[in-house]
Amino acid sequence: MASIWVGKRGTIRDYAGFNPSVDAEAIRKAIRGIGTDEKTLISILTERTNAQRLLIAKEYQALCGKELKDDLKGDLSGHFKHLMVALVTPPAVFDAKQLKKSMKGMGTNEDALIEILTTRTSKQMQEIGHAYYTAYKKSLGDEISSETSGDFRKALLILANGRRDESLKVDEQLARKDAQILYNAGEKRWGTDEDAFTNILCLRSFPQLKLTFDEYRNISQKDIEDSIKGELSGHFEDLLLAIVRCARNTPAFLAERLYRALKGAGTDEFTLNRIMVSRSEIDLLDIRAEFKKLSGYSLYSAIKSDTSGDYEITLLKICGGDD
């Protein structure tokens, strides 16, 4: 059965001739020797898929009586440590941790919440919900409810429940009807009917939404993004704009997130690690192409000029090549 976490446009593929016990032994030596052999760790963990890494971790535990992630945490440091631990974490657990981190402490990282909830499929969201509850004994929905409010909260909860239609079939009649509802809910009236925007944008499939946005332009002579910007505000506006951009082109949306994470003073490693790891087996090749289109330079060169050391080497291996 194909994994819901693997697509056709990733940079990391199954390693041919994979032998988890050989890899586990090599990692044991790399960690247990005098000083850590980072080179071996990087080459094994970036050249295996997540499913293969989890098998290595299982062998490692049988061999050493310790969890691989715990030994990596104890032996490595900084952003390099976070990245390596992410590589040996199951995808749903990784996303659950990222969501927890974005809602922890003072203030909520709305951008991270929006990014994860808009780019994951319904099936993925359901798995993330289970992983979240297993790890924190609280439902993801309850956490979102206590950290957010208003229309933003309402929309996030629908996305967190994994209720978006996933079918690839489109219905032209429904697209026209939805486009008219959106027009009546915003441009055509005084004040805005936020629920209409939430229900359509959070529940319809991406192919269906693309058709709806075309119909919307025919009716209103405006692009849906411009209407959202004119009618809505705050995090709710940001969320709906993210949904529109993901429905149109998810890799382009994520490329823009990477561009912002790498641009200017300082690097947003939280975002950089998350996108590089979570999309490495799904669509990172497409994200790379969109990044170049957006910025005029390659993602590889941006990582190279913005990071250093083992952290840089690992990210470049995940990136998988220069464009």
Curated annotation (Swiss-Prot):
Phosphothreonine modifications at: 267
Annexin repeat residue intervals: 18-89, 90-161, 173-245, 249-320
Sequence positions bearing N-acetylalanine: 2
Keyword terms of this UniProt record: Acetylation, Annexin, Calcium, Calcium/phospholipid-binding, Phospholipase A2 inhibitor, Phosphoprotein, Repeat
Pfam families: Annexin (PF00191)
PROSITE patterns, per the entry: ANNEXIN_1, ANNEXIN_2
Recorded coiled-coil stretches: none
UniProt note: domains: A pair of annexin repeats may form one binding site for calcium and phospholipid.
Name this polypeptide is given: Annexin A3
Organism: Bos taurus (Bovine)
Lineage: Eukaryota, Metazoa, Chordata, Craniata, Vertebrata
Gene: ANXA3
